[in-house]
UniProtKB/Swiss-Prot annotation:
The keyword Hydrolase applies. It comes from Sulfurisphaera tokodaii (strain DSM 16993 / JCM 10545 / NBRC 100140 / 7). One of its GO terms (molecular function) is DNA binding. The lineage of its organism: Archaea, Thermoproteota, Thermoprotei, Sulfolobales, Sulfolobaceae. Mg(2+) 2 binds at D175, D177, D238. This is Flap endonuclease 1.
């Protein structure tokens, strides 16, 4: 759900120095999809091992997590569980998009007349994150000594709940739904920052982390969180992907400001009832009362298992052994320093 137009005035760029010593609960699937999309070979295909198994996600997870730790940030990766039934339509839509992209990709390869940029586009659109890839990602993170949380349902909701409980300073995702789930602070671009090529253009831009604070956003807009959720429902969420036809985010904001709720706007005829083909209260409840649990997992950094990391990356997936060993050295050093920064941040709160 895209709230970009509404957050434009209150979002602010962050330096990594401002995040030093802080724990961030990360929507793991969101991060893994970013790695799968960004870490590609020149023809758009993902990195693969000698057996043809995709490794882009492991490459991104290992090296990007080390970079985050080197900035003094402690990541907590939160993985999806079983999605709500109401998400079935959106998941089916995504599946069809991937299948169509795969067909176009194969057709383009056969014809051999399409631009490399088009090949990349179709390759990225056909990205799949399998259960096996997710499990292997958890295994790697645990071997690295990084906190991993298994959500009962939506990882994004659980990451937001960890933030609500005060167990993390912010949640990190590209998706604004984190705000609807009640995250106090949302950081975008945490796992994406650096120079990135614009899609379909030979232009590179500097991507920096940005912070959106829920309370600041709600005060600026003069809304409650429930009303922000209603705007999301009008525009479309994962639980009603089509939203209400003909209404953009600015119109949705105007309507909710005027009537206070989606039901009232329907009752007064501002939004024709015939256009609403979903249960408003049910969808709102999925954001206000998502299936979440207080994590039982240890949320602190622990010692890494170097042999396990080498086994996963080098022995199983053909990563360069020297590079991985160098990464492990960086990892251990960064974790020591990040722990120190976290303790200092805790002390600073008392003075």
């Amino acid at each position: 759900m895209d709230l970009a137009e509404l957050v434009e005035e209150i979002k602010k760029e962050l330096s990594f120095a401002e995040l030093k010593g802080k724990k961030i609960s990360i929507d793991a699937y969101n991060a893994l999809y970013q790695f799968l999309a960004a870490i590609r070979q020149p023809d758009g295909t993902p990195l693969m091992d000698s057996q043809g198994r995709v490794t882009s996600h492991l490459n991104g997870l290992f090296y990007r997590t080390i970079s985050i730790l080197e900035e003094g940030i402690i990541p907590i990766y939160v993985f999806d569980g079983k999605p709500p039934e109401q998400k079935a339509q959106e998941l089916e839509r995504r599946k069809k998009v991937k299948e169509e992209a795969e067909k176009k990709l194969e057709q383009a390869k056969t014809e051999g007349s399409i631009k490399t940029s088009e090949l990349k586009k179709y390759a990225q659109m056909s990205i799949r994150l399998t259960n096996e890839m997710a499990e292997e990602s958890k295994e790697l993170l645990k071997a690295m000594g990084i906190p991993v949380v298994q959500a009962p349902s939506e990882g994004e909701a659980e990451a937001a709940y960890i933030n609500i409980l005060g167990l993390s300073w912010a949640t990190a995702s590209q998706d604004y739904d984190s705000l609807l789930f009640g995250a106090k602070r949302l950081i975008r671009n945490l796992t994406l920052s650096g120079k990135r090529k614009l899609p379909g253009k030979d232009v590179y831009v500097e991507i920096k982390p940005e912070l959106i604070e829920l309370d600041t956003l709600l005060k600026k807009l003069g809304l409650t969180r429930e009303q922000l959720i209603d705007i999301g429902i009008i525009v479309g969420t994962d639980y009603n992907p089509d939203g209400i036809k003909g209404y953009g985010v600015k119109t949705a904001y105007r309507i909710i400001k005027k009537y206070g709720s989606l039901e009232k706007a329907i009752e007064k005829g501002e939004i024709p009832k015939i256009k609403v083909n979903f249960n408003v209260e049910e969808i709102r409840s999925l954001f206000l009362k998502p299936q979440v649990v207080e994590p039982k997992e240890n949320l602190e950094l622990v010692d890494c298992d170097s042999n396990k990391i080498l086994d996963i990356l080098v022995k199983t997936h053909d990563f360069n052994e020297e590079r991985v060993k160098n990464g492990i050295e960086r990892l251990e050093k960064a974790k020591r320093e990040a722990k120190g920064a976290s303790r200092q941040t805790g002390l600073d709160q008392w003075f």
